[in-house]
Amino acid sequence: MILSSGMQEREAYLQELLPMQQEDLFQVFRLSDKREVIIRLLDPPLHEFLPELENKAEVAELAMEMGINIEQGTLRIKTLKEHNPMLGFRGCRTAILHPEILAMQVEAILRAAVRALRAGFEVHPQIMLPLVCTDHEIDQLMPTIRRTYNKVMDIA
């Protein structure tokens, strides 16, 4: 998903991830019955999910899975590498640039919470948007969260 070449491809990968995240979160809610659960979204830097460029076998395997050549795979990985990832592109900044990732995670949380409630568990999910520096960042993220909330609640 991280290395996808465009929105359509990224959306397809996100649809594959949604049920997996939803199931994981359902299990968390089930096990934490009656306790608050804080889910910290989009926290790790994206490069943590990528193979190291020095590991040619992993890069080649990933490129093959994506249907691209090794050079294209290497280039895509290089574009996501950061000099100091702890200060860079992660948390709310990822959500601002890729609101579709935020929407998928929020949808997974909400669907899992609804499922847990229907199964008789008391759930108290809290969503944390990490690394927020300004009100403006929250203002940019809230429309996606609200839209996703409304979408899930309309079908729940």
Feature roles, as predicted:
Residues 1-156:
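Conserved alpha/beta-domain cores
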